[in-house]
């Protein structure tokens, strides 16, 4: 029986450069090249792996099919979640590959994931403060939303550096349903902060998903580039 493997990301290499790995053996770890953000992708079974990459010591863990995603929440790897989700106000839903923000925050999300293994949602009725700091997310599965507010959520969203979010089919890039409210601006002290948002097929850039009305969206500052998907 073939052993099931899962994707794990390892950042910190020269963009577009070759990466030589010493281990883990037997899992297609030759001819590895970092992407444009200096990230490599390894496909491995569940377990903990220690190896070197371009002479650098690395350790990663894949547990229950979930490995490092390259995205952090308040400096913690999103996939592993906080030690105490209740007090931290967030957790990672491994089934839907979604960071669920259920507290007031503030939350800062950073990193790069373009393989659809990280989305973000603010849960129903929560008032929260969220900052995107050089965050790039691409939703790849039909119905995946890069950043969604659930019903009656109220969010103050700040962006620092350059962030770029793209949702998949039938979802808005940043989904704000009827009854939810989103206020957007650049982070204090970052006058050049920029956010790019793209909806999937049938979805708005910011607002409602397929054939759905949107809630209240207020833009207070910063550079914001928004595009709906085809027929959105």
Give the predicted meaning of each segment.
Residues 1-28, 32-232:
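A composition-driven surface/loop motif
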